[in-house]
C-alpha cells in the first residue's frame, strides 16, 4: 500500500513526509476496519480508498487559505482527516450529526495522534462556533445553494471562504446562488487514477 500511495503522490506532484504517509495509511486501515461494522463509506477496498478518499481530499490543500477550517457533513472524516494530516499547522473542526461517525473520528484522532482536529456531533443549523472560520469545506451538499444557505454563519466576515468539492458543475448551479454570495473561482482538480470531473468552487459573501 505504501508503494501505491507513493505512486499516486508522485503523479500528483505532491511531497509528504514519511510520518504523513504513515498516518494516511493508518487512516485507511482504520476506515476499512470500522467500515465492516459501521458502513461509513460505500468504498470497500483500501486501494480504492487511496484514490477516492485520500487523493481526492488532499489535492484540495494548495487551494485553501488560512489555518482554521470546518469540514461540514464530514462523514468518516472526508476531506477533513486527510487534510489535517497534510496540513499539520492548521486546525480542522469535523462536524457531523451521526454519533457513530463522531465515535470513529475520535478513535482515529486517538490512534493517529492528531492534535489538530476537533470532532463535533451537531447538525449544522444548531452549531454556533465561538468564532468564524477561515474556510468552510464540504463535499456533502447536493448543491452550492444548499451549502451557502446552511453554512452562511460559519466563515469569518470578509476574509472567510466557502470551499465546495464538486464533481460535474453546471452553469445553472453556479448561477443559482442565494443573494449575497459570489463565486470567486472554479478550479479543476486532477486526481490520479480517478475518472470523471472534480472541481473546487471557492465562494464568498458579498
From Swiss-Prot:
S-adenosyl-L-methionine binds at residues 73, 78, 124-125, 139. Its main location: cytoplasm. Coiled coil: none annotated. It catalyses: guanosine(527) in 16S rRNA + S-adenosyl-L-methionine = N(7)-methylguanosine(527) in 16S rRNA + S-adenosyl-L-homocysteine. It is found in: Cytoplasm. It comes from Sodalis glossinidius (strain morsitans). This is Ribosomal RNA small subunit methyltransferase G. Its EC number is 2.1.1.170. The gene is rsmG. One of its GO terms (cellular component) is cytosol. InterPro entries: rRNA_ssu_MeTfrase_G, SAM-dependent_MTases_sf. SUPFAM superfamilies: S-adenosyl-L-methionine-dependent methyltransferases. GO terms for molecular function: rRNA (guanine-N7-)-methyltransferase activity.
